[in-house]
Curated annotation (Swiss-Prot):
Protein's UniProt name: DNA replication and repair protein RecF
Stored InterPro entries: DNA-binding_RecF, DNA-binding_RecF_CS, P-loop_NTPase, RecF/RecN/SMC_N, RecF_2
NCBIfam families on file: recf
Sequence positions that bind ATP: G30, P31, N32, G33, S34, G35, K36, T37
Matching PANTHER family: DNA REPLICATION AND REPAIR PROTEIN RECF
Organism of derivation: Prosthecochloris aestuarii (strain DSM 271 / SK 413)
Subcellular location per the Swiss-Prot or TrEMBL entry: Cytoplasm
UniProt key word Transmembrane helix: no
Annotated keywords: ATP-binding, Cytoplasm, DNA damage, DNA repair, DNA replication, DNA-binding, Nucleotide-binding, SOS response
Length: 370
């Protein structure tokens, strides 16, 4: 997959901009505040229907504007073209069209244009709450599997309904009459998600170990899935996981009634990161953490390709400030010749094979091609 062109109107710092990257590695450089990251975010919007760091659509509008418009053209590895338009206004909300047909569900776009982001803010994947690591896992799986995306959305709907029942029955001595129905639905959907997540980590581990070995030496990385079932998870097949969930829900029924929320399921699971057996979140240095994160993303690029048969667009925001030059060059060596990458930086010096990279200077006139 590659981005041929994106036209940006009233998005973040850009009142009007046309950006046409080359195939391979593209370097977007310019001073801080020039809008480099905003270009990557606009591309991310068109590929995955949302911006960075869970920002709202309204926050992405240019100052004093009442709307923004993104028009993009992508071409797949097989030559199929996808025209994606994202239109947002304070009055009309957000609409997304694909090849001139408006999407009823934005989720229909997910996975069509594989896209991977690395940015300094994503350090929360390592240091943040378990929700951040679950989100990393879910974002990857949703780009691979439509079934997973549909089950994840369904699980969230069921969870919301079950929590509403728990909240409304706080003054009852017994569960709401239809609670068991929602519990069974939640267990079935939750078992699917847990199984897919565990299988993903098992398959992804060799890709990640290889990427980390290229970027660093000696340390052995490991990814581990920790279910909220704990020792109650006695089976790794879907039916067994669902049975374990149902049994455990029965055991914690009173606790859930007291706390008025669902205390068990994939929405409470954790992914643990280790280096040589030590918890990365607790013991890794800043350099180790950054290397761990970029290795995750580079490995994901290869993994998505093997799963989908389509190369991903790789967005790397301010990578030069996050890694030393040796690791930066190793990252570039790994992604060179493997799909399209777009990198932002405040400088363009210090790279041994800079001649192999397309340079885009942010010192442009608004409305002119970059």
């Amino acid at each position: 997959m590659r981005l041929d062109e994106i036209k940006i109107q009233n998005f973040r710092k850009h009142s009007e901009l046309i950006f046409s990257p080359s195939e391979g590695i593209n370097l977007i450089f310019g001073p801080n505040g020039s809008g480099k990251t905003n270009i990557l975010e606009a591309i991310h919007y068109c590929a995955l229907t949302k911006g960075f760091n869970r920002t709202t659509d309204r926050q992405c509008m240019n100052f004093s504007a009442e709307s923004f418009l993104l028009k993009s053209l992508f071409t797949s590895d097989t030559g199929c073209q996808y025209r994606v338009h994202v239109d947002f206004s304070t009055n009309g909300g957000k609409s997304i069209s694909l090849n001139n047909s408006q999407l009823e569900k934005f989720s229909a776009l997910i996975g069509l244009i594989p896209c991977i982001l690395f940015s300094p803010a994503e350090i929360t994947i390592v240091h943040g709450s378990p929700q951040e690591r679950r989100r990393f896992l879910d974002n990857a799986l949703c780009q691979i599997s439509k079934s997973y995306l549909e089950q994840l959305l369904q699980y969230r709907r069921i969870l919301q309904q079950r929590n509403a029942l728990l909240h409304s029955s706080w003054d009852r001595s017994s569960p709401a009459p239809d609670m068991n129905i929602w519990t069974e639905l939640l267990a079935e959907s939750g078992a699917f998600i847990i199984k897919e997540r565990m299988d993903f980590l098992d398959e992804f581990q060799p890709y990640f170990s290889n990427a980390y070995a290229i970027l660093d030496t000696g340390e052995i990385p490991r990814l581990t899935y920790r279910s909220s079932l704990g020792k109650a998870l006695v089976s790794s097949d879907r039916a067994g996981i669902a049975d374990s969930l149902m049994h455990r829900f029965g055991e914690i029924q009173h606790q859930e009634q007291v706390r008025k929320q669902t205390l068990l399921g994939p929405h409470r699971d954790e992914i643990l990161f280790y280096l040589d057996g030590s918890d990365v979140k607790k013991y890794a240095s800043q350099g180790q953490t950054r290397t761990f994160l970029i290795a995750l993303k580079v490995a994901l690029q290869r993994f998505l390709f093997d799963k989908k048969g389509e190369q991903s667009i790789f967005l790397l925001d301010d990578i030069f400030s996050e890694l030393d030059q040796r690791r930066v060059e190793r990252v570039l060596e790994m992604i060179a010749g493997f799909g399209q990458s777009l990198i932002t930086s405040t400088e363009k010096t210090g790279l041994s094979f800079l001649h192999e990279i397309s340079i885009h200077d942010m010192l442009y006139k608004h409305g002119d091609p970059l």
